[in-house]
């Protein structure tokens, strides 16, 4: 079976989603930098064999612009294949923008995708008989088919002017596919010290949190989007101009994304509204 046929078979397999154990201690965003730079997922096996090994793993990374917005998404997967050469693991790395898109758009496939840590991906890779998971520099060499995003100008969400005492105001949205459980909401509320939103009559904003870093004020809303997705809307009110601003924003966006992945959601894109 060649890699192209194998991608189709992996995509069509029946859903089976075991409960993920990816539950590290929550941390306040901005207080530490996540260690791995890539996002990892386990593809679970078919429903007919729930106790068997995972079907494969996925490594992904957003392509980011200077301001932290996503212009594309790179990904590669390792899955089992029939007919591998003697002595080699019966699997291979492959890259497919179509599969990357389907992980987010197809509910059946999404039900078989579990967000995991780098450590758990390493364990799954060994369980698949593939040996030690390559380092992230090597994994990036397997990214051959980028999923491109629309490069249109930012939308406007809220007033464009910075509040008094700040020189710039930016609004970002991290969009996620998947369902957030009640337990997940409790975990996020505790980790982010969120307060309930009392000024959203439509009930779309579940909670709000904020943090101050080096004179910059960051606040974010956890929001339901259309009843089918979730987002974290980050507002950055920037104090004195600094060459470090871009790095601080990208780090915070990364930490917010990681926290949502811990609760089983899959990041779709990072947009800027102002």
What spans do the regions from the language model cover?
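Short, intrinsically disordered low-complexity segments
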Residues: 70-115, 119-120, 126, 196-253, ...
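Conserved short beta-strand edge segments in small beta-sheet-based binding/regulatory domains
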Residues: 257-273
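Surface-exposed beta-loop interaction hotspot
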Residues: 118-205
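Short amphipathic alpha-helices in soluble, non-transmembrane regions
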Residues: 185-192, 245-260
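Short acidic, S/G/P-rich loop/turn micro-motifs used as interaction or catalytic elements
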Residues: 48-49, 179-182, 238-244
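Ordered, small/hydrophobic-rich secondary-structure cores
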Residues: 2-3, 24, 28-115
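Short, hydrophobic/proline-enriched secondary-structure or compact coil segments at domain edges
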Residues: 39-45, 172-174, 230-239
């Amino acid at each position: 079976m060649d890699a192209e046929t194998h991608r189709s078979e992996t995509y069509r397999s029946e859903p089976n989603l075991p409960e993920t154990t990816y539950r590290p201690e929550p941390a306040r965003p901005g207080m530490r930098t996540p260690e791995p730079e890539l996002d990892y997922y386990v593809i679970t096996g078919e429903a007919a064999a729930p106790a068997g090994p995972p079907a494969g793993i996925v490594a992904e990374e957003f392509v980011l612009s200077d301001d932290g917005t996503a212009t594309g998404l790179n990904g590669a997967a390792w899955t089992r294949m029939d007919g591998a050469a003697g002595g080699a693991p019966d699997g291979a790395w492959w890259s497919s923008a179509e599969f990357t898109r389907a992980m987010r758009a197809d509910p059946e496939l999404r039900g078989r995708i579990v967000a995991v840590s780098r450590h758990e991906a390493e364990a799954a890779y060994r369980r698949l008989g593939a040996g030690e998971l390559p380092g992230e520099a090597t994994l990036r060499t397997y990214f051959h088919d980028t999923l491109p995003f629309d490069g249109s100008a930012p939308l406007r969400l809220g007033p464009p002017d910075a509040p008094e005492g700040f020189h710039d105001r930016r609004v970002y949205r991290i969009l996620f596919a998947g369902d957030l459980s009640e337990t997940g909401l409790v975990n996020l509320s505790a980790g982010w010290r969120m307060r309930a939103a009392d000024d959203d009559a439509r009930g779309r904003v579940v909670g709000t949190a904020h943090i101050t870093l080096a004179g910059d004020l960051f606040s974010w809303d956890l929001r339901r989007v259309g009843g089918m997705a979730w987002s974290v809307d980050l507002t950055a009110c920037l104090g004195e101009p600094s060459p470090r601003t871009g790095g601080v924003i990208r780090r915070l966006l990364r930490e917010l994304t990681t926290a949502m992945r811990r609760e089983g959601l899959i990041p779709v894109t990072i947009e800027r509204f102002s």
